[in-house]
C-alpha cells in the first residue's frame, strides 16, 4: 500500500469487537443453547472491559437475541445473512498510518473451498462498511484473519500449511506471500512457520491456534510439553524450536495441551492460544479440563499488565474452533461517530 498502512496488533485500543450470533441455521444446531450462553458471557466480559459489541444477527433471530441481552448492555445489533459465525476469518482487518485508520479485507473462500462462504465473503462490503468512517479496501488475495498475527513492530507470523493450500491462491510461493503482506499490511518482516497443526483443525493450521505475540517481545505458544506421549508432542515441540530459532530475543511461554474428543471419538482442536485481547483484558478459553488452571497462570505470566478472564469454550470447540475464531476486534478510529454514540443507549438495532 502506498499509504504506508500497517496492520494493528490486537492490543491496540478498541472501540468494539464484532461477533456473529449463532442460530439454528448454522452448524451450531446440536449445541445451540450452550453456545448462545457462551456468546452472552463473552458479550458481558467485553462490556466489562469497556469494549462495545457489534453483533451480526439474522433478521429472523433479532427478537430472540434481544430477549437474551440485558437492555443496558452496549451492543449494536446489525441485521446480516452469513454462512457461519467464524467472523475472525471474514471480518475486516484494521490498519493504521500517521493519518488515521483503514479497514481492509481479503477474499474469504471457506478455508480453501472446504465450506460455502458466498454470504460471508459479502459481509464486509454489504453490511459492515456502513458502520465504518472509511470504505473497506479490498485486496485480490485469499486470506483469513486467523492466519495472521502481527506485533507493534510489523513482525508478522503465519503458517506454511495454511498459505500453501492450492485451493486458496493456487501455487502462490511463500516469497510472493511475504511481498503481499509487506504491500497490503505493512509487514516489515513475515515469518512463515513450517511446524504445528492441531488435529480437527479445518483451517490448515491457523496461527491463532498456535503462536501469539505479547506486547513485551514474548511468544505464547500452544505446546504439548505436558503430554509427551500425545500425537501432537513432536510437531508442537518443533514449533517451539522453530520460533526460538527465528526469534531468539523473544521470551517463550508454553501452554499445556488439553485432550478432548467428541462423542464420535474425534480429537477436538482445543487451544489455549485462541484467546482474545481487548482493552487490557484477555478473554482466555478454558475447556473444563485439568490443564485450565495452569494455562491461566501461564497467560498471567505472559501478560502481567492484562486482566485474564476465563471463558468456558467447551461448547465452541465442538465445532472445531474457539474464542478468537468467533471474534474480530475493531480498533478506535474505525467506526463512525454516530455508531459509537449508539452504544451509549444500551442494546439497539442498527437501521
Model-derived regions, located:
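The feature marks the mature, well-folded catalytic cores of soluble enzymes
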Residues: 1-351
Amino acid at each position: 500500500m502506498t499509504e504506508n498502512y500497517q496492520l494493528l496488533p490486537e492490543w491496540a485500543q478498541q472501540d468494539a469487537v464484532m461477533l456473529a450470533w449463532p442460530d439454528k441455521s448454522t452448524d451450531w444446531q446440536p449445541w445451540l443453547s450452550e453456545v448462545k450462553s457462551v456468546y452472552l458471557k463473552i458479550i458481558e466480559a467485553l462490556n466489562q472491559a469497556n469494549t462495545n459489541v457489534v453483533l451480526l444477527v439474522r433478521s429472523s433471530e433479532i427478537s430472540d437475541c434481544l430477549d437474551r441481552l440485558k437492555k443496558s448492555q452496549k451492543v449494536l445489533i446489525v441485521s446480516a445473512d452469513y454462512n457461519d459465525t467464524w467472523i475472525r476469518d471474514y471480518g475486516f482487518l484494521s490498519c493504521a498510518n500517521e493519518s488515521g485508520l483503514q479497514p481492509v479485507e481479503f477474499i474469504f473462500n471457506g478455508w480453501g473451498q472446504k465450506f460455502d462462504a458466498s454470504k460471508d465473503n459479502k459481509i464486509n462490503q454489504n453490511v459492515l462498511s456502513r458502520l465504518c468512517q472509511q470504505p473497506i479496501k479490498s485486496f485480490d488475495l485469499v486470506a483469513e484473519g486467523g492466519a495472521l498475527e502481527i506485533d507493534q513492530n510489523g513482525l508478522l507470523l503465519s503458517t506454511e500449511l495454511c498459505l500453501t493450500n492450492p485451493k486458496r491462491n493456487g501455487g502462490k510461493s511463500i516469497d510472493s506471500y511475504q511481498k503481499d503482506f509487506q504491500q497490503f499490511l505493512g509487514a516489515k518482516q513475515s515469518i512463515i512457520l513450517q511446524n504445528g497443526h492441531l488435529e480437527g483443525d479445518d483451517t490448515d493450521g491457523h496461527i491463532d491456534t498456535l503462536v501469539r505475540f505479547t506486547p513485551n517481545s514474548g511468544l505464547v505458544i500452544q505446546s504439548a510439553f505436558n503430554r509427551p506421549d500425545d500425537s501432537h508432542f513432536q510437531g508442537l515441540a518443533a514449533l517451539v524450536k522453530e520460533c526460538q530459532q527465528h526469534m531468539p530475543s523473544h521470551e517463550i511461554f508454553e501452554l499445556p495441551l488439553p485432550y478432548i474428543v467428541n462423542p464420535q471419538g474425534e480429537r477436538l482442536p482445543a487451544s489455549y492460544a485462541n484467546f482474545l485481547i481487548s482493552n487490557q483484558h484477555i478473554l482466555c478459553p478454558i475447556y473444563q479440563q485439568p490443564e485450565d488452571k495452569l494455562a491461566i497462570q501461564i497467560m498471567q505470566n505472559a501478560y502481567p499488565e492484562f486482566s485474564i478472564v476465563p471463558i468456558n469454550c467447551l461448547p465452541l470447540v465442538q465445532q472445531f474452533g474457539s474464542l478468537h475464531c468467533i471474534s474480530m476486534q475493531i480498533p478506535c478510529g474505525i467506526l463512525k461517530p454516530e455508531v459509537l454514540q449508539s452504544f451509549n443507549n444500551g442494546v439497539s438495532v442498527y437501521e
